[in-house]
């Protein structure tokens, strides 16, 4: 019980508010980006012709994924000074959902955009004209989302996450969000995320030769490279410093 804790090793309240403020700025920027793509997608003006080549619908979905991640990451730093134990427990259960759905949206949509280019240029080489509708592109996104949703449902049903307080020493406790087999479930989730980002990277590499003004391939490859690099460093450190709440939050938050 939180009321019995003499000293809680929690994320610093100042650090939480700082990261929340940064996340809110990111959310506002993504909302503005969504508004821009909505205008571009619905406008008949030739000014937005180049933007329409970028598939505004899927750019919007990517921005939505980013917003979900931006909302989820600061909430990982909730502590007893800013939230009740019930709220923290709810966030504990929601966190895998939010991050996995955000990940699935971002990288399945980037893969879908590249798959569209692969199909178009493959047909063009045979002198065939082809159009790929948004509905056809959603056939790439939907299975990815379904896989992650089914996984999270199984995790909740079989081995639900709980917020627990563990002793750091005789007078200090820290809270952890875990289940009986957290490492197994987290390992599978990381594996699914790695598989999705690998597919996204392979699709982008297939389009490497396409000029930058027709494709975001090089940008996608840079995003994938940076994501993999940061993840490979952050995830091991996150589990090594289990008792250092603020340090773990700084590692994951950015």
Please give the residue ranges for each predicted region:
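Alpha-helical multi-pass membrane domain signature
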Residues: 2-254
């Amino acid at each position: 019980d939180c009321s019995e804790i003499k000293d809680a090793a929690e994320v610093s309240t100042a650090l939480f508010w700082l990261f929340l403020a940064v996340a809110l700025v990111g959310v506002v920027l993504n909302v503005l980006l969504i508004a821009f793509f909505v205008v571009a997608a619905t406008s008949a003006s030739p000014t937005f012709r180049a933007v329409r080549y970028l598939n505004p619908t899927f750019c919007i979905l990517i921005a939505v994924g980013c917003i979900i991640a931006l909302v989820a990451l600061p909430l990982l730093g909730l502590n007893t000074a800013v939230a009740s134990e019930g709220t923290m427990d709810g966030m504990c259960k929601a966190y895998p959902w939010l991050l996995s759905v955000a990940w699935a949206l971002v990288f399945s949509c980037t893969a879908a955009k590249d798959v569209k280019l692969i199909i178009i240029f493959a047909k063009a080489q045979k002198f065939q004209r082809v159009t790929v509708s948004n509905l056809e592109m959603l056939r790439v996104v939907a299975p990815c989302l379904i896989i992650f949703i089914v996984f999270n449902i199984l995790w909740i049903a079989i081995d639900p996450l709980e917020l627990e307080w563990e002793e750091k020493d005789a007078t200090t406790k820290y809270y952890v969000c875990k289940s009986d087999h957290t490492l197994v479930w987290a390992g599978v989730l990381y594996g699914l995320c790695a598989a999705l980002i690998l597919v996204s990277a392979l699709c982008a590499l297939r389009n490497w030769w396409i000029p930058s003004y027709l494709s975001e391939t090089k940008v996608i490859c840079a995003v994938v490279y940076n994501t993999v690099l940061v993840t490979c460093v952050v995830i091991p450190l996150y589990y090594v410093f289990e008792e250092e709440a603020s340090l773990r939050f700084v590692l994951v938050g950015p």
